[in-house]
Amino acid sequence: MPQISRYSDEQVEQLLAELLNVLEKHKAPTDLSLMVSGNMVTNLINTSIAPAQRQAIANSFARALQSSINEDKAH
């Protein structure tokens, strides 16, 4: 079942493109890009979510990430 978002596809795609452009500008390899992205998520959770909700949000985020991973063999 598709997820309904309060954000338009255009908003999401524009922000994603800008974030990817920053990583490309700095020629960040995949491992550094993942590290920085993970740190950004951690920072957002720790600074924007109430302490009592942080673990649930982190678990929900992790499940969403895992469910969005493409399992084909190509990379």
From Swiss-Prot:
Matches recorded under SUPFAM superfamilies: YejL-like (SSF158651)
Pfam family, one: DUF1414
Domain of life of the native organism: Bacteria
Gene3D superfamilies registered for this protein in UniProt: YejL-like
Residue pairs linked by disulfide bridges in the UniProt entry: none
Family the entry assigns: Belongs to the UPF0352 family.
Name of the protein in question: UPF0352 protein YejL
